[in-house]
A protein has these predicted regions:
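C-terminal catalytic histidine-bearing segment of alpha/beta-hydrolase fold enzymes
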Residues: 203-246
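The feature captures the conserved acid-bearing segment of alpha/beta-hydrolase catalytic domains
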Residues: 127, 132, 138-146, 157-194
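Active-site-adjacent alpha-helix of alpha/beta-hydrolase-fold enzymes
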Residues: 151-157, 183-210
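Short amphipathic alpha-helix adjacent to the substrate-entry channel of hydrolases
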Residues: 42-59
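Short beta-strand element of the alpha/beta-hydrolase
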Residues: 25-34
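N-terminal cap/lid segment of alpha/beta-hydrolase-fold proteins
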Residues: 1-23
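Primarily recognizes the serine-hydrolase "nucleophile elbow" in alpha/beta-hydrolase
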Residues: 83-148
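Alpha/beta-hydrolase active-site loop
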Residues: 70-89
Length: 246
C-alpha cells in the first residue's frame, strides 16, 4: 500500500490517499464524522488496510468544521474535494469506478451531495461519474448542529433546504446507495433513516439500487471494530462495492 498524506486540495484543506499496488482500482472518497465540529480524515485508517488489500483506493478528505465553518461551508469543501479526486486520481493509476462514503456527519454531507445536484453543478461535475454512495448513519433531516447555528433547538426534526430529504424526488434517478444505521443509534437516527428509505420508495426509485444494513449496537461503533482480523466497516464497504454490483 502507498500512503500519501496531507495533500492540499483547496484553501489549506488536506486529504490523504491510500493506494493499492495494482495499477487499476476502484476509488472510495470518504468523509469523516464528528458532528460537523470534530473528527478528521484519519477516521478511515482502521478500514484502510482491508480495503486497499482488496484493490479499493481511498481518498479521505478533511473539511471545515464548527466553530470556524458556517452552513454550507463543509458541503462546499466536500464537493471541491470530490472535484479534486475526479481530476487527479488517474495520475495514480487507472480508476474504474468512484464511490462516495461518509460516516455520521460525513454521511449528512454524502446525502446532500447525492440528493442536491446544485453542488455538483456548481463545480461542473457530472453526477453520473459517481457509481454509488455509502451513507453511514447520516442525518437526512437538517443536521442538529446546523439547527444550533440557526438558534434552533438541536432536537427539532426539520426538513427544509438544509436537509437531504428535502431534495428527494427532484432527480429522475440516483446511483446505488447503501444506508447503514444501528439498533441503538443516536436518538431518532434509525427512524429518520427509515423515513428516507420510505420517501425513496414513495417516489418509485429502483429499490434494487437501495440497500439497508442495520448493525447491532451503538452509533457507528463498528467503524473502528476488527473481528477475526477483519475490519467490520471495511468489509461492509467492500461487499457493497465488489460483491453487490447488479
Amino acid at each position: 500500500m502507498i500512503k500519501i498524506r496531507d495533500l492540499e486540495y483547496y484553501n489549506n484543506l488536506k486529504l490523504d490517499i491510500y493506494l493499492p499496488d495494482s495499477d487499476t482500482f476502484d476509488l472510495l472518497i470518504y468523509f469523516h464524522g464528528g458532528g460537523l465540529e470534530s473528527g478528521g480524515k484519519e477516521e478511515i485508517i482502521p478500514s484502510s488496510d482491508y480495503l486497499v488489500e482488496r484493490n479499493i483506493a481511498i481518498i479521505s478528505i478533511n473539511y471545515r468544521l464548527y466553530p470556524f465553518a458556517k452552513y454550507p461551508d463543509f458541503i462546499l469543501d466536500a464537493v471541491k474535494g470530490v472535484k479534486w479526486c475526479i481530476e487527479n486520481i488517474n495520475k495514480y493509476g487507472e480508476c474504474k469506478d468512484i464511490y462516495i462514503g461518509g460516516t455520521s456527519a460525513g454521511a449528512y454531507i454524502t446525502q446532500m451531495l447525492c440528493f442536491n445536484s446544485y453542488y455538483y453543478k456548481k463545480e461542473n461535475i457530472d453526477p453520473l461519474k459517481i457509481k454509488g454512495y455509502i451513507h453511514d448513519a447520516g442525518q437526512p433531516t437538517v443536521h442538529f448542529n446546523v439547527l444550533k447555528e440557526n438558534g434552533i433547538d438541536s432536537r427539532r426534526i426539520i426538513i427544509n433546504e438544509d436537509a437531504p430529504l428535502y431534495y428527494v424526488g427532484i432527480e429522475k434517478e440516483y446511483p446505488r446507495m447503501l444506508f447503514i444505521v444501528s439498533t441503538n443509534d443516536l436518538e431518532n437516527r434509525y427512524e429518520q433513516t427509515m423515513l428516507m428509505l420510505r420517501t425513496l420508495k414513495h417516489f418509485n426509485y429502483d429499490e434494487s439500487k437501495i440497500e439497508l444494513k442495520v448493525m447491532e449496537g451503538k452509533h457507528c461503533e463498528y467503524v473502528s471494530k476488527v473481528i477475526d482480523n477483519e475490519s467490520v466497516f471495511g468489509k461492509i464497504i467492500y461487499e457493497f462495492i465488489k460483491e453487490k454490483e447488479p
